[in-house]
Amino acid sequence: MRERIITFVSLLLVALLSFPSVSYCDDQTILYESFDEPFDGRWVVSEKAEYQGVWKHEKSEGHDDYGLLVSEKAKKYGIVKELDVDEPLNLNEGTVVLQYEARFQEGLECGGAYLKYLRPQEAGWVPQGFDNDSPYSIMFGPDKCGATNKVHFILKHKNPKSGEFVEHHLKFPPSVPFDMLSHVYTAVLKSDNEVRILVDGEEKKKGNLLSAEDFEPPLIPSKTIPDPEDKKPEDWDERAKIPDPNAVKPDDWDEDAPMEIEDEEAEKPEGWLDDEPVEVEDPEASKPEDWDDEEDGEWEAPKVSNTKCEAAPGCGEWKRPMKRNPAYKGKWSSPLIDNPAYKGIWKPRDIPNPDYFELERPNLEPIAAIGIEIWTMQDGILFDNILISKDEKVAETYRQSTWKPKFDVEKEKQKAEDEAAGEADGLKSYQKKVFDLLYKVADISFLSAYKSKIMELIEKAETQPNLTIGVLISIVIVFLSLFFKLIFGGAKAKVEKKKPETAAETSTSEAKTEEKAEAVAAPRKRQTRRES
């Protein structure tokens, strides 16, 4: 009984202690979408004709965790969720954290996975009409296609003078992770105009909303601009260097000397076949049966390399090679000297910018909804755990509890796959080294009688790599057989010479000649196979 009371009190204390924390998180969380349940009813798919992509409620590969899935390739997608709040989220007060997960399960070659944080729309707007023209306050997230590879952070800020909304892009944003793992993207906006971009909880970029070094175009225009009415004077000389007017071409400067001349010291290689053409007609070619001389013209056999040239240093007319002409100097030109009339590169004078204004704090548009409006060539993009919070600690808590466990599992799986692939590559590399060694062994001169057999074994092993060990054993046996033959059988073979066996010796010689021919042909065959 006493133990039950202690247990009950402990549970009560835990509940009481955790209650303020839960309330604190709820107070700081404007939106959290886990996609644990089907998104129908909470998210509205655009009904515009161009958005044909089908959104699905699917599990992330290898997990029981659900997300919002891009299910088809080469489609436009549009979906939106309005914030369930009384008033749109004010971005000009305190800290605001935007965070979500994205996973490219099929990789990403050309497509986006960014979110648009929509400002309040015009009267009469409905979520079903969401499209690319629906105005947003912030666009944030990965985008990759061609030369584009960045995690966008774009502000649409209203110019206080013109009243027009202008896109301001964060300069030098982080790159998109190139793997197929789950990644979490976080943007933190602070009240001191600081903006931070995190990928997987690690800060990748920090900037200031009002800094011209961090945003293009800058939110605050420059105080001065080039005078559009100013024009360069006609006598303004921008040439820093000019040809020396007093320079004279040297008398020994030959402008007509060629860059290359024949090498008079070169001699025609011995054995050069002057009367043999480099190419000859293919003797095995025959005129096609359907060839019509009147329509197709006179048939000519295709050309092939002249086999006689393979053993010779060359065929056809021999010509001396060319070499660089030591007397070559090229066209003469006057050396350059400093221009005494040089005034520098002209630029218009600066005048006060009529569009200049000052800001202590950007007037960011509030957020009323979240939209995903993308055109992607890949399917398998999964969105999950979309969060808008006023506290960085809340965002960190969600990263650790929702993203980190999945990422760790995926990372371990990827590591195991990479190791397996590495072992396979290592085995292939080992086999290649073995075969290279075996080919060198086959070329040893005193093994010429066995070369055809060794080559046959090697070629068989190359087509069936699992036989590599067996081939090694076979070649070792050949070595041992030859070794014992040389030690125990070599002397007797030299002493005995019988005339009746001359025919047999001739036959053996012919056999060896054939084997040598095969041995010569075998490396050539091997080279061709390797080159192909």
Swiss-Prot record:
Residue ranges crossing the lipid bilayer per the database entry: 469-489
Topology of this chain in the membrane: Single-pass type I membrane protein
Basic and acidic residues bias locations: 226-242
UniProt region (P domain (Extended arm)), positions on chain: 225-358
Binding site for an alpha-D-glucoside: 114, 116, 136, 143, 373
Residues reported in the UniProt entry to bind Ca(2+): 34, 65, 384
Region feature Disordered, mapped onto this chain: 208-302, 493-532
Cytoplasmic side: 490-532
Keyword Ion transport (UniProt): no
Coarse class of the protein's main subcellular location: endoplasmic reticulum
MF terms (GO), sorted A to Z: calcium ion binding; carbohydrate binding; unfolded protein binding
Described function: Calcium-binding protein that interacts with newly synthesized monoglucosylated glycoproteins in the endoplasmic reticulum. It may act in assisting protein assembly and/or in the retention within the ER of unassembled protein subunits. It seems to play a major role in the quality control apparatus of the ER by the retention of incorrectly folded proteins.
PANTHER family xref list: CALNEXIN 14D-RELATED (PTHR11073:SF1), CALRETICULIN AND CALNEXIN (PTHR11073)
Similarity field: Belongs to the calreticulin family.
Annotated protein name in UniProt: Calnexin homolog 2
